[in-house]
């Protein structure tokens, strides 16, 4: 008897331009649709990070790539063998939602960059997402050239050459390009084979203190639930180190905002892990990899509507400091990513920046700027260790655009 549900051991981001087929690709591999927010259904684009797990299996008697499958039964009727379960993070491809994409990148071990074969390369968001992977240092990348069913052979080859030219000199320059049709299920076995070889499960230290990067938080109680039947708030995110068990005590930082005498400050929140969910199953222990649901004893009003997204949880006393301001070393890009591609001016004192640190996105005001470093005062504090990478966005026209990367000092 095979174990059908296993905890995912690696997080793979799906990135690329809106409507290039990322969500269809997840559905093809996992049978799940990641757009589970009502607003997303209406607009047809992933707004918050969508998650879905897929179990890769193989039929050992078949040749590559035919041996790779997500089915439990091989063509000859025998049972397929479990390779590993992966968690896909479907990052939004919508321009104004770049911050969500960047917060998702903080929990990705590798990425599949989805590029449509029937559109010019690169589209603005494709370029911006690739830049984000570069900034955060994700270099295990596979490129899926999707929608090949909509073009002829010559168009597909021209598009392939455009992709190769586009990724030249970037973190994805050696990434394999796999032609697929997620809609028609073409070459999905080859894509799985390529993911297996290019995006390995990272080595992790099982003895480190648990650290959960919170990317979502929910109140799962239905309206009208009586207080006796209320379920505590739920955190969704990724364990980046250590392990977490039911009944563990955890601290969440920066925590909740407390207002006193017209001043507000953030205070860490402590609670107990009531339940753990991984790979769609309730489990007693979770290890790094995949996306988890952590049921807590928190008042659900604290967690509803992603109120704790961007926070960090772990054993009390083990977390990095909460920072209301910090100094960072800055490396600016040569130009703003996007259609207008204008040059980037140096950061100046007084300007607002949108900063993504781990899964947290906050706005900071620059209090001091020198050549390659600046100090910022944050609107909402973050919990982050020294050396953290920070994506820096500046207001360009009506949008926040990625302009560089900072390293927390």
Swiss-Prot record:
Residues 90-93 are annotated as: G3. GO terms for cellular component: cytosol. Gene3D superfamilies: P-loop containing nucleotide triphosphate hydrolases (3.40.50.300), Translation factors (2.40.30.10). The keyword Transcription regulation does not apply. Transmembrane segments: none annotated. eIF-2 functions in the early steps of protein synthesis by forming a ternary complex with GTP and initiator tRNA. This is Translation initiation factor 2 subunit gamma.
């Amino acid at each position: 008897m095979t174990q059908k549900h296993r905890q995912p051991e690696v997080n793979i981001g799906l990135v690329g331009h809106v409507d290039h087929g990322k969500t269809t690709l997840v559905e093809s591999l996992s049978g799940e649709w990641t757009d589970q927010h009502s607003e997303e259904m209406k607009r047809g684009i992933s707004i918050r990070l969508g998650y879905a797990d897929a179990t890769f299996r193989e039929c050992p008697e078949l040749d590559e790539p035919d041996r790779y499958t997500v089915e439990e039964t091989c063509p000859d009727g025998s049972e397929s063998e479990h390779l590993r379960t992966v968690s896909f993070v479907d990052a939004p491809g919508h321009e104004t939602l770049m911050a969500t994409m960047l917060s998702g990148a903080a929990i990705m071990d590798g990425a599949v960059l989805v590029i449509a074969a029937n559109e010019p390369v690169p589209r603005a968001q494709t370029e911006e997402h690739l830049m984000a992977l570069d900034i955060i240092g994700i270099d295990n990348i596979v490129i899926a050239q999707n929608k090949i069913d909509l073009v002829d052979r010559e168009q597909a080859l021209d598009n392939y050459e455009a992709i190769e030219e586009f990724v030249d000199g970037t973190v994805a320059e050696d990434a394999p390009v796999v032609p697929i049709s997620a809609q028609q299920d073409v070459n999905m076995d080859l894509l799985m084979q390529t993911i297996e070889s290019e995006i390995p499960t990272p080595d992790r230290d099982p003895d480190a203190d648990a650290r959960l990067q919170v990317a979502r938080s929910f109140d799962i109680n239905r309206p009208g639930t009586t207080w006796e039947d209320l379920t505590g708030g739920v955190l969704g995110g990724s364990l980046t180190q250590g392990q977490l068990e039911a009944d563990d005590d955890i601290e969440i930082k920066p925590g909740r905002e407390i207002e006193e005498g017209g001043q507000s400050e953030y205070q860490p929140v402590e609670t107990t892990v009531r339940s753990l969910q991984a790979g769609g199953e309730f489990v007693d222990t979770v290890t790094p990899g995949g996306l988890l649901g952590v049921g807590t004893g928190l008042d659900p009003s604290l967690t509803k509507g992603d109120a704790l997204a961007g926070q960090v949880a772990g054993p009390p006393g083990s977390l990095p400091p909460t920072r209301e301001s910090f100094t960072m070393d800055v490396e600016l890009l040569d130009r703003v990513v996007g259609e207008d591609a204008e040059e980037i001016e140096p950061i100046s004192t007084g300007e607002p920046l949108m900063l993504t640190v781990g899964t947290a996105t906050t706005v900071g005001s620059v209090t001091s700027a020198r050549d390659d470093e600046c100090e910022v005062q944050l609107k909402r504090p973050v919990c982050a260790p020294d050396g953290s990478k920070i994506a820096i966005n500046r207001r360009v026209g009506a949008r926040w655009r990625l302009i560089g990367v900072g390293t927390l000092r």
